[in-house]
């Protein structure tokens, strides 16, 4: 447990951030660019799409991107049609609010990704295969994003998660080969990310806030 019993702990630390750093938009843009933009960002687990043709739309991105299992493996790609920017996978034309489904299989659309608006059709790796009534198929493929797979955990970004977390991934509890994905929960929280990390990194709150874990 953290040693907080000494009065010196209550003095202002030299490294304490100014209050404005939690609210300044320019600071936030720098954080997104220099911290998150240069990190390995967790996207999801490969068990979200266990079979070829399976897709999973990223709800925390409002279905703007999706994981798709192709013959080459798991792909992360844009889920927005290049023609009129419609959401494709997960779009329910019979639902009053449109895109609602989170996952499925492409066998429902002949093994391809098909836009519900004008039927533009893309392959499982995002290549545009056809555009109805166009004399030639435009060169307008879906944007794809490189993924790094570590024990089934999928990351995007320039850093190598296997190198950053080598000791962590060597532990037996990170072997998910015999697991089956049950469900995914998404919690959207309205607070500064630094506040969450600061609380997460101290264990003073564990006893009263997480009974049984202290």
Question: Where do the protein language model's features map onto the residues?
Answer:
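C-terminal catalytic domain of Rieske-type non-heme iron oxygenases
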Residues: 68, 78-79, 146-148, 153-214
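Short, contiguous pre-domain boundary segments
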Residues: 5-19, 177
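Non-catalytic accessory segments flanking enzyme active sites
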Residues: 21-60
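Peripheral, non-cofactor segments flanking catalytic/redox cores
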Residues: 1-7, 29, 211-214
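Rieske [2Fe-2S] iron-sulfur-binding domain
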Residues: 48-159, 166
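A structural signal for well-ordered alpha-helical segments within the folded catalytic domains
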Residues: 25, 62, 191-194
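Generic structural signal for secondary-structure transition and capping sites
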Residues: 36-40, 86, 205
């Amino acid at each position: 447990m953290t040693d907080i019993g000494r009065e010196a702990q209550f003095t202002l630390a030299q490294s304490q951030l100014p209050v404005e750093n939690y609210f300044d938009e320019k600071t936030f843009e720098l954080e997104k660019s220099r911290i998150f933009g240069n990190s390995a960002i967790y996207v999801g687990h490969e068990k979200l799409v266990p079979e070829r043709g399976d897709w999973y739309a990223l709800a925390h991105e409002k279905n703007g991107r999706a994981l798709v299992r192709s013959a080459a493996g798991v792909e992360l790609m844009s889920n927005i049609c290049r023609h009129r920017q419609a959401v494709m996978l997960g779009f329910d034309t019979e639902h009053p609010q449109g895109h609602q489904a989170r996952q499925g299989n492409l066998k429902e659309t002949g093994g391809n990704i098909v836009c519900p608006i004008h039927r533009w059709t893309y392959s499982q790796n995002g290549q545009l295969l056809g555009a109805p009534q166009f004399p030639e198929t435009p060169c307008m493929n879906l944007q794809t994003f490189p993924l790094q797979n570590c024990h089934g955990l999928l990351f995007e970004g320039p850093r190598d998660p296997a190198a950053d977390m080598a000791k962590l991934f060597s532990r037996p509890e990170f072997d998910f080969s015999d697991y089956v994905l049950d469900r995914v929960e998404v919690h959207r929280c309205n607070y500064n990310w630094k506040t969450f990390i600061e609380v997460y990194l101290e264990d003073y709150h564990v006893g009263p806030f997480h009974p049984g874990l202290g």
